[in-house]
Design a protein with these regions (language model features):
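Glyoxalase I/VOC metalloenzyme domain signal
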Residues: 2-9, 14-34, 52-112, 119-284
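Short acidic/glycine-enriched loop/turn segments that link adjacent beta-strands
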Residues: 41-44
Length: 284
């Protein structure tokens, strides 16, 4: 039985060392970036969001070291910048937490939090969430997973933030490199009650649910063969490697300029130019 309260990938969290510099970099890559959000003192972090439909990316940075952000800081220390967490959409976080508990995964949370949001008309509102996490030690492919219930969608999916010069529309795949892709994919599939799917080049996909993006586990060598001519410098041997984004490829090519590499029928930003995250723009 698939999880009833978890319905596929909601957003990808890219952990960065300098939050404001990362936001400027993503603006140069043709993304519309939200105003900076600041989380609670307990969380000690801040973020910028890059909104698609029905999902998004989050650039996350530590503003003040706290106990809560210790795992994120440890990730940066060990891996450098890159995809540190993937969020699923939670219909009801309290019920979702009980669902994973029943499957042998003691949940962290649910936890309620919010951050102020400056709306396009200049007024200040709040984005409110209720999240729960699978146990921190359960990190398939080295990436933690959690689920996020949006209590105020209207302060997150703001129409003005959803139009991008690079033509980005939605997440299609989350690419995860690992020496043993099949084992990592099986681990994730068990955690979210999904089936794995073998791909022609030996990679293993795990659908995240509904019409949302798939996870694709593959070796670094397989990733290099999928995207010839794209430098994979800076990627860890095991961890989040990149995002495949459905987009208007011509718009992406124009917006990216010299940062983009034509490969695999689309245009690709190498990890070194994407804050540790490869961005592959493909036809929507």
């Amino acid at each position: 039985m698939a999880l009833k309260n978890v319905i596929g990938i909601d957003h990808a969290v890219v952990m960065v060392k300098d939050l404001d510099k990362a936001a400027e970099n993503y603006k140069r890559l043709g993304f519309t970036v939200s105003p900076r959000g600041t989380h609670s003192a307990h969380m000690g972090s801040g973020n910028y969001t890059i909104m698609f439909d029905p999902d998004y990316m989050e650039l996350l940075g530590v503003l003040t070291p706290t106990e809560h952000n210790a795992p994120a800081r440890a990730y940066l220390e060990k891996n450098g910048e890159g995809i540190e967490r993937i969020a699923f959409t939670a219909v009801d976080s309290a019920e979702g937490a009980e669902e994973i508990r029943a499957r042998g995964y003691p949940p962290v949370g649910p936890t309620d939090f919010e951050r102020p949001v400056t709306m396009p008309d200049g007024t200040v509102s709040a984005a409110k969430f209720r999240t729960f996490q699978w146990p921190t030690a359960e990190a398939p492919g080295g990436v933690r997973i959690f689920a996020c219930q949006h209590k105020t969608r209207e302060t997150v999916w703001i129409p003005e933030l959803m139009k991008h010069a690079n033509g980005a529309r939605r997440l299609k795949q989350v690419l995860m490199v690992a020496p043993e892709p099949a084992a990592e994919a099986a681990h994730l599939a068990k955690m979210i009650d999904r089936e794995t799917r073998n791909e022609a080049d030996g990679a293993v996909a795990v659908p995240s649910g509904g019409d949302r993006a798939d996870f694709v586990f593959l070796t670094k060598d397989q990733l290099g063969k999928r995207y010839p001519g794209v430098s994979l410098a800076g990627l860890p041997a095991r961890g989040g490697a990149g995002l495949v984004i459905a987009a208007d490829v011509a718009a992406a090519e124009k917006a990216l300029g010299v940062a983009g590499v034509n490969s695999a029928g689309g245009v690709v930003v190498p990890p070194a130019a994407g804050n540790g995250t490869m961005l592959a723009f493909v036809k929507a």
